[in-house]
Amino acid sequence: MLERIKVCFTESIQTQIAAAEALPDAISRAAMTLVHSLLNGNKILCCGNGTSAANAQHFAASMINRFETERPSLPAIALNTDNVVLTAIANDRLHDEVYAKQVRALGHAGDVLLAISTRGNSRDIVKAVEAAVTRDMTIVALTGYDGGELAGLLGPQDVEIRIPSHHSARIQEMHMLTVNCLCDLIDNTLFPHQDD
């Protein structure tokens, strides 16, 4: 058991090192995409399933409340939090539409969809991205593995942050770290002296 614990830590560290080498440009582009949207008076919609839903909620909470320092609230909505809406849509046998319907209702040109999917193949996330495209929204996608179907939907203005791993747990850990990086970059860009 002790050896297995060391393996988990070692794999996580190795994934972090690989991501630190491969992802800074994509994370920086994503942060600036989010910042520009916010500066233009737009909002960020975010979605994910399972652990990715938790990461989406963490991002939205960090925008609305705060990340590490006090600052004004920023507009972000986690689409996976309203159980009544989610179950009403799913009850009509539209499971794949649980996020897309919300994107079509709430999303506007200039808004950003933060779509989080470990493999990039979750049908409801793919449909949300397709809906965001029809609303002239920009997409920031957090993925892993080969990026899945999600990667093929992104245009030149969109940003994919693909974790260099084929292990779901490692990808999800890195998604959380990436979300924290994005929150930090947004705060330090919009409120550079807030922590002084």
Swiss-Prot record:
Q: Which cysteines are joined by disulfide bonds?
A: none
Q: Which Pfam families match?
A: SIS_2
Q: Which GO terms describe its biological process?
A: carbohydrate derivative metabolic process; DNA replication; positive regulation of DNA-templated DNA replication initiation
A GO-annotated cellular component: DnaA-DiaA complex
Keyword annotations for this protein?
Answer: DNA replication
InterPro entries found in the cross-reference section: DiaA, GmhA/DiaA, SIS_dom, SIS_dom_sf, SIS_GmhA/DiaA_subfam
The domain of life is Bacteria
Kindly list the GO molecular function terms attached to this UniProt entry. carbohydrate derivative binding
Domain called SIS: residue spans: 34-196
Oligomeric state and interaction partners are given as: Homotetramer; dimer of dimers.
Family, according to the entry, reads as follows: Belongs to the SIS family. DiaA subfamily.
What does this protein do, in the record's words? Required for the timely initiation of chromosomal replication via direct interactions with the DnaA initiator protein.
Protein name stated in the entry: DnaA initiator-associating protein DiaA
Q: Which organism is it from?
A: Salmonella typhimurium (strain LT2 / SGSC1412 / ATCC 700720)
